[in-house]
């Protein structure tokens, strides 16, 4: 049993909200409560939180920007840590260092402001820098692995260390920290000098493509499935006749079948059921088993 008075005393000054519904913070607008939702303002507060949780044997996790995640309806036990206030972006020559809570889109606009090229591919990717590094986010032929130099991480024990891009062992939507449990707290990117107008035009072009193809008008978890070798997930889903298929308030997007949108106050179970149905149907129709890109976390509603 957690001693709440001890928690409040030892973590005084840190913004902690009790039994806080996570659907207020997720891109899907679903998710049950976090026992303790924390918003550290700096690395010092973050380390205090993690060391307290470890000492008191309270589970903890970082939710980041919650853009490619489904939080189950039963919520998450222990501490959920948000990096909303860790969002500093700094430029030094041709490198950008961004804290994990900085929005990836904001980081690309800082690059544009300084006429730095190489980050245009990320101009429409929602979510945070930390989450983007964690999953090696990418679009339009670019990915985080192409520009990352190194990142600072918080280990499960509460220590801070630096990991090089090579040590990250990036793969398609994967990195070594998905296995180690290390949490990105900042990342350094190497870019190249470019022409402001050319960079701006490319970002406008990619943003227009995204607006044309993606269902941005509804809450969603972003791209649901990884791209199967030699195929497109959205095309396989469309060919299986699943465009517009709905379970509860969640629907396979009629605009892009690779997305699932919350059109009518859906819940996390609707998402899980629809994902399972799509995987089963596509495999039956095409022989190809889709693999989830979106992470599903938390507990089912009892």
From Swiss-Prot:
**PANTHER family, per database record:** UDP-N-ACETYLENOLPYRUVOYLGLUCOSAMINE REDUCTASE (PTHR21071:SF4)
What highest taxon heads this organism's lineage?
Answer: Bacteria
Q: Which residues form the active site?
A: 173, 223 (proton donor), 293
Q: What does this protein do?
A: Cell wall formation.
Report the Gene3D superfamilies cross-referenced here: 3.30.465.10, UDP-N-acetylenolpyruvoylglucosamine reductase, C-terminal domain, Uridine Diphospho-n-acetylenolpyruvylglucosamine Reductase, domain 2
**Entries under Pfam families matching the protein:** FAD_binding_4, MurB_C
What are its GO biological-process terms? cell division; cell wall organization; peptidoglycan biosynthetic process; regulation of cell shape
Known pathway? Cell wall biogenesis; peptidoglycan biosynthesis
What gene name is listed for this protein? Answer: murB
EC no.? 1.3.1.98
Q: Which GO terms fall under molecular function for this chain's record? A: FAD binding; UDP-N-acetylmuramate dehydrogenase activity
Q: Which reaction does it catalyse?
A: UDP-N-acetyl-alpha-D-muramate + NADP(+) = UDP-N-acetyl-3-O-(1-carboxyvinyl)-alpha-D-glucosamine + NADPH + H(+)
Protein name per UniProt: UDP-N-acetylenolpyruvoylglucosamine reductase
Localisation = Cytoplasm
* Residue ranges constituting the FAD-binding PCMH-type domain according to the UniProt record: 29-194
What enzyme category does the UniProt record give? oxidoreductase
Keyword set includes Cell division: yes
Similarity comment: family membership: Belongs to the MurB family.
Q: Does the keyword Cell division apply?
A: yes
Q: Which cofactor does this sequence's record say it needs? A: FAD
Signal peptide extent: none
